[in-house]
Amino acid sequence: MDEFRVDVPWGVVRIEAIGSSLGIPEIDPLESPAEGNRECVVVAVVHGDIGPVDISVSLQDGEDEGTCVYDDVLRVLGEGVEVADLVGDDFSHRYDLPEGDASVRVCVDDPGEAQRVLIRIVAKA
């Protein structure tokens, strides 16, 4: 499991297939803590001005921690997946995954003001 603590500008964490052309989904944190399309997921977290966010990324199945706010499939395009801030300027972590579908499950400590995020990205066989 990869774990890191970051200040998240704009209060949005992006999980995206590298090379995606679908664009980043719009998110309104007051309406929903997470939104996604076939190649990208965004998750609302506390803004960097308020405090840091602890992010854990696992490429294996396991138990949830907190509240699950997203559970769907992401199309990986062959170059892996990036977990980053909204534009990728402040932090960016890349994970090798095979081309094809991967399940993505995101759990947070508080859907309204997440300060801990667990992201599970598991390639489907």
Which residue stretches match the model-derived regions?
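A glycine-anchored, Pro-Gly-centered beta-turn/N-cap motif
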Residues: 98-107
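Short, surface-exposed loop/turn motifs with a glycine/proline- and acidic-biased composition
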Residues: 93-97
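Short, solvent-exposed coil/turn segments at beta-strand boundaries
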Residues: 36-39, 79, 99
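Extended, solvent-exposed segments with strong compositional bias
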Residues: 64-91
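Surface loops and adjacent helix of pleckstrin homology
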Residues: 86, 107-109
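Primarily secretory-pathway and cell-envelope proteins
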Residues: 1-67, 112-125
